[in-house]
Amino acid sequence: MCLIKTIKINELEKCYITNILKEDKVVIKILYKESKNSFLFKKYNYYSPYEDYKYIKDKLNTSPLGIYVLTSSSTESLNIMINEGFHSFLTKEIAENYKSKLLNDSRAILCKCIIPKGSTIVYNDSEIVSNQIIFIEELK
């Protein structure tokens, strides 16, 4: 999953590619859920559909942001691609739409996550990528 952010060239001087969060932000993440072997009670593993990164509830996860400038023939805008970091959605509706159209997989579930205050983020109209995230709970 990659986030693409387009910046108009005439706005480049007053635009930052990244921002620092001033307060915690609730986001929605799509994860795969699979049951673990347990004799006494049901346990699950949660992991990223794209990178197989394992998430543990209430644990702070950190990652660098991989930010790349894409070449373009346009003289009006610049496309920035972020392919490293924790990719999430800004709303549950956007995540549900993405899940139903592109991830038609019974293992895929929506999860509530928090990007903590002080995290570095990049966002567009629907997605957000951060260098830190905490998996809170599975959404029903």
Give the role of each language-model region:
Residues 1-86, 92-140:
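Conserved NAD+-utilizing ADP-ribose enzyme module
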